[in-house]
Amino acid sequence: MIQTTVLHPKHLEAGAKMVDFHGWEMPINYGSQLEEHHAVRTDAGMFDVSHMTIVDLTGERVKAFLQHLLANDVAKLTVPGKALYSGMLNPDGGVIDDLITYYLTDTFYRLVVNSATREKDLAWIRHHAIDFAVSVTERPELAMIAVQGPNAKAKAAKVFTPEQNAAVEGMKPFFGVQAGDLFIATTGYTGEDGYEIVVPQEKACDLWQALLDNGVAPCGLGARDTLRLEAGMNLYSQDMDESISPLAANMAWTLAFEPASRQFIGRAALEAQKAAGTQLKQVGLVMEEKGVLRAGMPVTFTTASGEKREGVITSGSFSPTLGYSIALARVPRDIGEQAEVEIRKKLVTVKVTKPAFVRNGQKLV
């Protein structure tokens, strides 16, 4: 049985092309993926992300629980509302999921996890919560709308109440605040400014319509994917999964090895990988000639000593902002500034870059 979000009627009303996304019927576009992409890079667009899973954690030992569960350290969160991005790892150091954690009070944290991993995430979290007497509450009655782009905050301000505007004034990135019936967070998956707004289901359609009336363009999963790829943001199950180390997925910055006494799940495996120094790494690829880089394509190169090496593209697409093809790839660490990708039985030279291409409207390559 395919699931739908509370905003499903609004998508049909807007003429969306609907697709099955991990068991959810979601909009892939509303006519033009390209126009939706550019709307977010140059103005303001909105996405229905109500399929994401919101999980509230409460208990006296909830901080200690999250310090055990997550590879990043929630002890960094000292101001209520502050959030961090982290991997949730298995004992082998593979990524069960990547998620955002909000610190709300000393006994209350909120997680936002991926929809495709919902069941295994909840089972894993609940299993480990038992030892810490932490209560795990899924919040399916909440919907979520992401409003993204250089003009997103200004347009959202027209929809917020004066109290909500006061609550978000001057709020830095990666913060969330409960303001009236909305939980408003300065997070996103596009590389642009904006909010992710958690709203009670019964008020979601009105909020969507109000944003629409104020010139925010509805955007589908197609544009969401090209935007996050340009920003160099991982997509779970493509760029990392339970068999992939965060060290091989450009997530080393999310690993908190200090203090040494914090024994988070997967720590020993990661320390062994670091000591071995043989872990693959994630890079960006740029191909300015015609053709499109796609996930699964092999990436080959020759080292300075003449040895042949091979990696693989994990995410690839035409970049609407740059006007040529880009990709994220997992490759041996000794890759140089160029590599080759086989496209239609022809080897094409690609430039190797850092794994981020566009942020805040600025081209990085």
Curated annotation (Swiss-Prot):
The glycine cleavage system is composed of four proteins: P, T, L and H. The glycine cleavage system catalyzes the degradation of glycine. Signal peptide: none annotated. It comes from the Bacteria. This is Aminomethyltransferase. It catalyses: N(6)-[(R)-S(8)-aminomethyldihydrolipoyl]-L-lysyl-[protein] + (6S)-5,6,7,8-tetrahydrofolate = N(6)-[(R)-dihydrolipoyl]-L-lysyl-[protein] + (6R)-5,10-methylene-5,6,7,8-tetrahydrofolate + NH4(+). Keywords: Aminotransferase, Transferase. Belongs to the GcvT family. It comes from Aeromonas salmonicida (strain A449). Its EC number is 2.1.2.10. Coiled coil: none annotated. The lineage of its organism: Bacteria, Pseudomonadati, Pseudomonadota, Gammaproteobacteria, Aeromonadales. It is an enzyme of class 2 (transferase). One of its GO terms (molecular function) is transaminase activity. GO terms for biological process: glycine decarboxylation via glycine cleavage system. One of its GO terms (cellular component) is cytosol.
